[in-house]
Amino acid sequence: MSYSLNSVIINPSSKSNPKNAVILCHGYGGDGNDISILANYWKNFLPDTLFVCPDAPEICKVNPAGYQWFDLMDQTEEETLSKSLIAENKLNKFIDEVSNKNKLSFNNIALVGFSQGCMIALQTALKKKDQIKCVIGYSGKILNIKHLNQNINSKPEIF
């Protein structure tokens, strides 16, 4: 099954159709393969869960072997926000694809993010009109609190 973002896909260990999906968003300069290590640990505890680990949409400017959700280098806060909105749209589309292709409700989808992946996961999930189950964030932050406060559409659980 292909998606708009190149992805590492770990199918349910139960071999059945997925009942849930976890989308894992890597950090700045990483890729889906890096963060798929978590999925390989978690799959035994969540046997009916599909794990999808996309590569961010841009080649990383600092580490061309990896990817970035948006550029962080030498920009104003407004430029960073503008670029993050592009990544947000791509991740939002990706979430919709995972839902549609696997016949899952949004309430059965979780986002996990590390570092920059946490930033884009929080921004996307809180602004998404169709509420997902939750966001689990590691070592991240809210990118632009003013923008986010003005655009919250849903309130998934956040861990």
What feature does the model see in each segment?
Residues I37, Q123-K127:
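Active-site signature of alpha/beta-hydrolase-fold catalytic machinery across serine-
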Residues V112-G117, A121:
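Gly/Ala-rich beta-loop-alpha elbow adjacent to hydrolase catalytic centers
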Residues I120-T124, K146:
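Hydrolases whose catalytic domains are alpha/beta-hydrolase-1, hotdog thioesterase
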Residues P54-D55, V112, I136-S139:
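Alpha/beta-hydrolase-fold catalytic nucleophile elbow
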Residues S4-L104, N108:
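Serine-hydrolase catalytic machinery in alpha/beta-hydrolase-like enzymes
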Residues S13-S14, G140-F159:
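The feature captures the conserved acid-bearing segment of alpha/beta-hydrolase catalytic domains
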Residues D130-I142:
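A conserved short beta-strand
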